Amino acid sequence: MEIEKRMVLKPHGSMLAIQNDAIPGNRSTIKDTLVNLKDNLSDIRKKNPLIKSKGGIPLLYDKSEHTVYVDATDSHSLIIGSTGSKKTRLVVLPLIHMLSYAEESMIISDPKAEIYNRTAAMLKQSGYRVTVLNFRNPSLGESWNPLAIPYELYKSGKRDRAYEFINDIAANLMCSELSHQDVFWEYSASDLLFGLILLAFKQSKKEQVSFEDVLNLRADMFQDGNPNICMWEKAKRDILIHHSLIGTIEAPNNTRTSILSTFDQKMRIFAFQENLTDMLKQNTISVDRLGFEKSAVFLIMPDEKTTYHRLISLFVKQCYERLIYLAQNSEQATFRIRINYILDEFSTLPTISDFPAMITAARSRNIRFFLFVQSQKQLEKRYQVEAETIESNCNNWIFLTSRELSLLKSISALAGQTAEGKPLISVFALQHLDKEKGEALVFSGRQFPYITDLVDISEIDHDRYEILEMSKRTKVQEKMFDRDTGVTGVSEEEDIQKEIERKFDELFD
C-alpha cells in the first residue's frame, strides 16, 4: 500500500551497529501499540493492563479493514493544523465518536457550534447527559455562575478552599493577558476583584452571589473614584478583605484611578450584554457527575471575536479544579469514567493559570487533554517558556499542515535524519501532505514517527446526522439565604407569584 511506503520510522542517531537509514514502517508493529475498537476490553487489557477504557484519539485508519486504531492510554495529545486543514473532520469529530463508543465523558470547546450540531444528537441517543454553555447565543442552553462553587464552599465553612477558587477567578479574569510592560495594574486589579468577591460573600444573604453583585459593590465602594470610608471601615474588619482592598483604597488618586480603570475594562464583559449577564447570574450546570456518568459539556463560543474567550478559559480552569477536588475526596482518588477535555482553538484562548501543572497532574485522576492549535507561535505567545512544558506533556503529536517555518523545521528535526544527514521528511514535504486523503504526520509515544491517513468523519456517520435543538434558558427565581438560621427561602417576587397561583386555584377549583 502507498501508506506503507511512506511511513518513516528510523531516525538518525541510532547506536545500533547497522546502516542508519530510514526503513519503511511496519503497520502491524504500530497497530500493536494502539487499540482496535472492535476488540473486547478484556482482550485489550491482557496486552496492556494499564488501559482502563478503549476510547482514544484515532492515530491510524485501515480503510481495507474499515478499522480505526486509537491510543486508549492516558496520554495527552497535541494536534497542529492551520485554518482549513480539516482538523475538525479528521480529528475532532472522529475523536468524539470514538470516546462515545467507550462511554467516556467530554468537555468540548466549540467555535461556531459546528461540533455540537454534528454530534450532540448522537450523544443524546447514546444515553449521554448533554449540556451546553452557549456564549454565542446566551439565551439558549444552561446558565453558569462562576461564583456559585466558591460561594457554596464559603457558606459551608470551607473558607480556604473557597479562597483558592476566588483567587483562580481573579487571576484568570485580570491577569490572563498581562501587558508584560507593567503588570502592576493587572495584579492590583486582581487584588481588588478578590477583595470585592469576598466582601460580597460576607455581606450577602442571597442563595447565589453573581458578578452583578460584585459590580454593584465596586460602584458603591468607589463613588466617583473615591473610596466610601463608611463601607471601608466595616469591610476592613476582615483581615483578608483588608489586605486585598487596601492597595486600591489607600493608593494616590491617580494610581487608584488607573487601577479602577483596568478593573472596569476587564469586567466590562459582565455588564454590557443583558442575556449574558442574566446567564451568569444563576447556575443550572453541574460538572460533578462527569466522572460518574457519561456526560458531554459543549462550550459554544463565537469564532469571529475573542470577547468571551476569557470565560471559556475560566470555565476550563474552574471545572478542572472542581473535578480534582471531587477526585481527592473520593475513595479511589480518581474517576471511574475518564474525562476528556477537547479544546479546539486552544492557542487562541487566554492563558489558563497553572495549565502546565494541570496537564501534568491530570493523568493520575483519569483526565485527558486534547489540545488543538493553529501554530506553535500562538502557543508560545500565550504561555511563553511554559509552552514547551505543555508540548512535552503531550505524548501524541498530530501534524496536518502549517506555513510556520520555525514549526516546520522543528517537526522535520523531530522526525530525524538519514545517515547522510538528510531529513526523513523535509520542510517541503511537510507542506504537501495530501489534504484530501487526510494525510498526517504522527508522533506517538516512543514509536517512530509515521505518515498515515486519518479517518474522515464521513466514513463514520456518512454525513447523515440530526441536530439536537437547544432549549431556551429559563430564569431561576432568586432565593434568600438566612445566615443566622441556615435556611434558604424564596424571594419576595416568588412569594407573590405563589400567592397569585393559590388565589387562581381557589377561584376555579
How should these model regions be labeled?
Residues 2-71:
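Pre-P-loop entry segment of helicase/translocase ATPase cores
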Residues 2-6, 437, 452:
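Short intrinsically disordered, low-complexity coil segments enriched in acidic
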Residues 53-54, 58-64, 68-367, 382, ...:
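P-loop NTPase motor domains
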Residues 122-125, 146-151, 385-389, 413-418, ...:
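Short secondary-structure boundary/capping segments
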Residues 309, 452, 462:
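Short acidic, gly/pro-rich beta-turn/loop elements at beta-sheet edges
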Residues 359-445:
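Conserved ATP-driven motor cores of ASCE-family P-loop NTPases powering translocation/secretion/packaging/pilus
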Residues 450-456:
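Short amphipathic beta-strand/extended segments with alternating polar/hydrophobic composition
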Residues 459-469:
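Short, surface-exposed linear segments at secondary-structure transitions and domain or protein termini
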